[in-house]
C-alpha cells in the first residue's frame, strides 16, 4: 500500500483488508470460547492443540502467521497450548512473541487429550480423518471439515 500512496492512489480498501486480517486471531479465539461454552467447558485452563503454525500450507515460513497471536491470546487466558506442524519443529522467541514450544506428534493421544483443536494451517501432511475421529472439538479456520459434524465449528 505504501507504493500506491506514493502515487496518490486511495488505499482504504487495502488498509481495511489488513485490519480484518489483523483481527482474525481474536475472532478465532472468541469462536473457540463460544464452542467450549456450548460443550460446558471454559477457555481458562483448557488444553488446546494448534494445528499448523506456518503462514501458509506446506511451507516452514512462520512470518506473519496468525497462529502466534492466537497462541499469545490463549496463553493470557491460562490455556495449556501445544501445537503440531510437520514443517515447523520448534517455535523460538522473536522480537514480537515470547513463544518457546516444540511441535508435538499428531496422534490419537495428543488429539484426545486436548479439549479442542484449532486448524490454523491446513498442511497436506495432516491426517484429517485422524483429526476428525479423535478430536473432541474442532475449530476449522480453513474449511477442511464438514460443518454438519456437531464437533466442528467454522471460524
Regions found by a protein language model. Name each.
Residues 1-155:
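Structural/interface elements that position substrates and couple domains in central-metabolism enzymes
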Amino acid at each position: 500500500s505504501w507504493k500506491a500512496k506514493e502515487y496518490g492512489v486511495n488505499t482504504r480498501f487495502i488498509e481495511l483488508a489488513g485490519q480484518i486480517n489483523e483481527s482474525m486471531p481474536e475472532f478465532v479465539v472468541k469462536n473457540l470460547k463460544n464452542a467450549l461454552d456450548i460443550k460446558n467447558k471454559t477457555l481458562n485452563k483448557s488444553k488446546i492443540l494448534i494445528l499448523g503454525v506456518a503462514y501458509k500450507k506446506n511451507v516452514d515460513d512462520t512470518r506473519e502467521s496468525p497462529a502466534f497471536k492466537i497462541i499469545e491470546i490463549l496463553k493470557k487466558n491460562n490455556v495449556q497450548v501445544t501445537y503440531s506442524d510437520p514443517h515447523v519443529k520448534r517455535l523460538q522467541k522473536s522480537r514480537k512473541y515470547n513463544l518457546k514450544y516444540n511441535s508435538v506428534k499428531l496422534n490419537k493421544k495428543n488429539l484426545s487429550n486436548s479439549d479442542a483443536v484449532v486448524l490454523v494451517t491446513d498442511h497436506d501432511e495432516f491426517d484429517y480423518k485422524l483429526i476428525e475421529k479423535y478430536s473432541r472439538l474442532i475449530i476449522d479456520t480453513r474449511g477442511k471439515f464438514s460443518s454438519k459434524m456437531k464437533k466442528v465449528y467454522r471460524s
